[in-house]
Amino acid sequence: MSETLRIEIDVDRALAILRELSPASMQAAWRRTLRKTHVWIKGQVAKAVSKETKIPQKVLRSRVYFFLKSYDSGKVWLGLNAVEAERLGDPRQTKTGVTAGRFRFQSAWLMKRIAPNGPVYRRAGKARLPYERVKYDWADAGEAAFRNIAELAEQRLLTILEQEVNYEIQKAIGNAK
């Protein structure tokens, strides 16, 4: 499932405030704003998806990336590929399969001799071979959470920008800490 989600945020109102500062101050405030907004989006997406799917936030945060394309634009990327079962928690062999974290995978097994905490496998057909690695698909829940957070991102961006502009103004008049 590879779909591009494009979010347009109108920042003209915010940039009007920044035009009152020097170009270097304006650029510094905007870059900090983009970076802090990315950190906020990363945390919120991880929190929302983790709450819905029970996948650990640590695993989800490693799948959110931010690219600063130019001085005035950035791109947030969320990897929606299925998560390997062994990344969901410490895999344990049970009578009926494997348990990893809060998830149970029926008819799955670990290769204890090769890698005790390694990949979890399941037969791909009725025969002995082939077998495949077990993965947990979370794309639908992840995309829905990302869309919800994207709707809130513009307001958060403006809030952070206001704080950063205030910091630059305080720095210019000598009151910054």
Show the residue positions of the predicted features.
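Short, Lys/Arg-rich flexible segments
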Residues: 1-177
